[in-house]
A protein has these predicted regions:
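Hydrophobic/aromatic residues positioned on beta-strands within the core alpha/beta folds
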Residues: 81-82, 101
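Acidic, metal-coordinating helix/loop segments flanking the phosphotransfer/catalytic sites
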Residues: 31-50
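Two-component/phosphorelay signaling modules centered on CheY-like receiver
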Residues: 12-30
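Conserved acidic carboxylate
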Residues: 9
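Acidic catalytic/metal-coordinating carboxylates
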Residues: 34, 61-64
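Active-site residues of response regulator receiver
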Residues: 54
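Short amphipathic alpha-helix used as the core "switch/output" element in two-component signaling
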Residues: 63-75
Length: 125
């Protein structure tokens, strides 16, 4: 069974790329480019094995989405992707799984998402 990944990314050049890369590596991908839509999807009970999350989104900020997932105990299912090195360093110090944009290694992205997804506890509440 294919792992389900939610890609929350508003950059028009990146979300199709993430979608294509992850589908090529046999993930079932849902892409949302707005934080408010992402929150609705996460609250409606749709299960995901992994989530990639941009912090700077239109609508609900990615930080708020992350905090909601953290309160539910689902932060371990998130790979935060940010263009801001200071944010990445701060997140990594706190133990958050994070990558800096641009993601220069397809293998690193796929490996991180696979590692998260294979924990086999889908995000569902």
């Amino acid at each position: 069974m294919r792992n389900k990944v939610l890609v929350i990314e508003d950059h028009r050049d990146l979300y199709p790329l993430f979608d294509c890369i992850l589908q090529f590596h046999d993930f079932q991908v849902t892409v949302v480019s707005d934080g408010t839509k992402a929150m609705e999807l996460l609250k409606d009970g749709t299960p995901f094995d992994a989530i990639t999350l941009d912090l700077h989104l239109p609508g609900t900020p990615g930080t708020e989405i992350y905090e909601m997932l953290e309160k539910r105990g689902d932060a371990n299912k998130v790979l935060v992707i940010s263009a801001y090195l200071d944010e990445i360093k701060d997140l990594e110090i706190r133990g958050v799984n994070a990558l800096q944009k641009p993601v220069l290694s397809v293998d690193l992205l796929v490996d991180r998402v696979r590692e998260i997804a294979e924990q086999k506890v889908p995000v569902l509440r």
